[in-house]
Amino acid sequence: MLALTRKKGESLVINNDIEITILEIRGDQIKLGVSAPKEVPIYRKEVYTQIQQENRKSADAQNAQALKELFG
């Protein structure tokens, strides 16, 4: 993992088209601004993890249904 130090108002750029800016620092919280193309999905980690879990459940259910139909 790359660790960088930034101050309020400073940014970093990822892959030439994603910019992350430190908007505010208050106590132990940091407010980030993210500029990225619309086709780049951006999620908080806890939301992303939940989406992955739901996708796995859905895929498992679809696979189970396909097996039932195949072997009836």
UniProtKB/Swiss-Prot annotation:
One of its GO terms (molecular function) is mRNA 5'-UTR binding. A translational regulator that binds mRNA to regulate translation initiation and/or mRNA stability. Usually binds in the 5'-UTR at or near the Shine-Dalgarno sequence preventing ribosome-binding, thus repressing translation. Its main target seems to be the major flagellin gene, while its function is anatagonized by FliW. Gene3D superfamilies: Translational regulator CsrA (2.60.40.4380). The keyword RNA-binding applies. Belongs to the CsrA/RsmA family. InterPro entries: CsrA, CsrA_sf. PANTHER family: CARBON STORAGE REGULATOR. GO terms for cellular component: cytosol. One of its GO terms (biological process) is bacterial-type flagellum organization. Homodimer; the beta-strands of each monomer intercalate to form a hydrophobic core, while the alpha-helices form wings that extend away from the core. Keywords: Bacterial flagellum biogenesis, Cytoplasm, Repressor, RNA-binding, Translation regulation. It is found in: Cytoplasm. NCBIfam families: csrA, PRK01712.1. This is Translational regulator CsrA.
